[in-house]
């Protein structure tokens, strides 16, 4: 089982949806943040193993936050997501140090679950 997870999105309804998805996959320790500042506070306190970050945040963007998280002295799996499915977001997420990018309409994808849990296709 993974350690704490963090969902970062300025829309509380989206955060709630992502939390429900993660709980449905068996994850219990899930934090929420609505801004870059809240995310950084959470990260420094709880040291999550996975952070799901929306691109658009009120005090920055998910790519900048991903770069800041990469500077932390422990390993985190960072996934960037957005309602904008522009293919350029994949490359931008990778450059920012994220392990992947998902459009918000694909958040229920088994591929996302495997990615955040660091599993291959043939693992249960």
Please place each PLM-identified region on the residue numbering.
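The feature encodes the CheY-like receiver
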Residues: 58
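Acidic catalytic/metal-coordinating carboxylates
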Residues: 35, 61-64
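Alpha4 helix (beta4-alpha4-beta5 surface) of REC/receiver domains from two-component response regulators
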Residues: 64, 85-102, 106, 110-114
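Acidic, metal-coordinating helix/loop segments flanking the phosphotransfer/catalytic sites
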Residues: 32-50
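Short amphipathic alpha-helix used as the core "switch/output" element in two-component signaling
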Residues: 63-74
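Two-component/phosphorelay signaling modules centered on CheY-like receiver
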Residues: 12-31
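Active-site T/S-Asp motif of two-component receiver
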Residues: 53-54
